[in-house]
Amino acid sequence: MKTSESKILLKRFIAVILFVICISATSQAQLGSYAGSFSRMGFGARGLSMGNAMVSDIFGNINGIYNPALSAFQIDGNVNLGYTFLSLDRKLNFLGFTKKFKLPKQQQGGAGITLAWVNAGVSDIDGRDNDTRQIGLFSTFENEFYLGTAFLLNENLALGVGFKLYYAKLFEEVTSTSFAIDLGAIYKASKNLSLGIAIKDFGAKYEWKTSEIYGSLGNTTVDKFPRILDLGASYVLPKNFGIVSIAVQQYFSPDYEADSTGVVPEKSNNTVLRLGTEISIVPQVKFRVGLDRIDFSADDFAGNLRPSFGIGLDKSFSKTINLGIDYSFQLEPFSHDAIQNITVAFKFK
């Protein structure tokens, strides 16, 4: 496909995204605190600094947890280890591996795999009784274990499926385990343009049982994850000057059950826009800028925005080994401190 045709296709795709956003903007709902929010904050410094607009990005260092189909385009093995600096005694850490493989006796096509672990939690929670006396310090954690597989149907089209295992602890003996599935696809429209789609968190939920603590007075509370639809496009700028990505993310609110008063919470969907770019000053240095959580339906539009920037440095030690360090800085709503992440990226052939 010629460059001019790629630009036309990209413009049409952006028009579709804007049309979806305009329709969704009629909703009065705001992006709420859905269950499993830690798994939607982003994965690694590169993704965070580019506004998490990564569902279609096959041109940079790929993290397949954004879309299970991405791994089919990661030729070199890519290992990421990330640590996030957060306020309010929170933690968020990443460990991931993504690589494309050729199947036995296969001349064309191939398959890809992603293995990842996301860990989040809050420590030093001050516990008090009804008389405000301190009873100890508590902590909570959440984990996501991810296995993503992808298959190239041809050199330009890949399909993928991701398997997730969530394990979380709310309080002492109150834990929950959940299994979920992601589906994704990538289409490489030209050498400079790729399109991506992913549907995430089929079946994800937390089920909290408190009978271990309260006995017969305990109950079971179910917190369902929202189902998420990601659509995106990534474009390589002329002369390989950089990458520009745009993505739209649709949150489909879970079905709620009636509470003790018989009231069923209102169900509403939310749409957010994501933008990101990566500029290569020299091959070993990359500057990144992004904007996440662009929610046109929010009452406080500016209050939901998450602007970000970052830098990436890498060094080749041989023809088969490359080591990089990525840094991201992202402003967080309702907090005086920014989200900062440092990720070590190790690539090998």
What does each of the following model-derived ranges do?
Residues K2-I14:
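Bacterial N-terminal signal peptides that target proteins for export
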Residues K2-S4, C22-A25, I243:
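Intrinsically disordered, low-complexity segments
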Residues E5-S6, C22, Y34, L305:
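A general, composition-driven signal for non-globular sequence regions
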Residues L10-K11, F19, G160:
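Compositionally biased amphipathic helical and low-complexity segments enriched in hydrophobic
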Residues I14-S24:
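Bacterial N-terminal signal peptides
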Residues Q28-K349:
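Subset of outer-membrane beta-barrel
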